């Protein structure tokens, strides 16, 4: 009971101080296709190298001009300040999940040229070359889901076409369904800590509602049976409870979360909730006016927030126009800062920039 009371008291709370955030631009990936930027790549640190793989963009014509989206298979690694083409993914993939695990990356799900995939791979770097090992597939195809790691447990949450919450143990990589979301949520942000799983934002593709809420569920061994059987969210006594809401009243659709070494969740980017919600109801006649706006008019989030599970409070880490992105790749740096790679500047237009964030 104390846990839930503390959540209610902390709901929407943002610490009054702002940490000092430093933004440092990195070398661009030396490739003509990536020079136009990509969104939703796999992104993580393998060993000491930043890895950016896959992703999607509109390389020939813009979305406004009716251009076709292209999805990539390239694997790029930033080693000693220089980009190396480390190999190719088995499939051209975007909108998947990336987990950093013991010097390797686990790449799960995503969209392969218009089709949601259930494939999972382990990626390691050996002498600058990517080595990929197939892992057990997901129980169902997943993309645009939330993902998070807590100790030796990996979690995937929602996304396109599913309300499932799946978990696996590092080293075994056998995914089991451990819960269901109370509603479909595409592009939520997930975070696991202390035996609880948090979910923020996302949009419901059935009702077209864009969430500004947070949810939390106990997901430790005292609640989840050993056989990881499903906890149905539609039961009268749903295990989901309200968590502290998104601090600026917006949504985390299009945002990317990463767990910092100090145990907090950092969230980068995201769309403007009101503008995105209106766009979900656009008619064909609205398409050209909507896509013709300047990037600043979409009001993507510049602020970077951190959630502390110990206090139940959000802290503003800083704000910078460079962070006004949707679908950026985000990875935790060895020094505790973040790498940010690509993302959308506006619908259909990607950023080619990569940068680091430090506090």
Residue ranges and their predicted role:
Residues 19-359:
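Kelch-like beta-propeller repeat domains
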Residues 1-7:
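Sec-dependent signal peptide recognition
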Residues 14-15:
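C-terminal motif of bacterial Sec signal peptides marking the signal peptidase cleavage site
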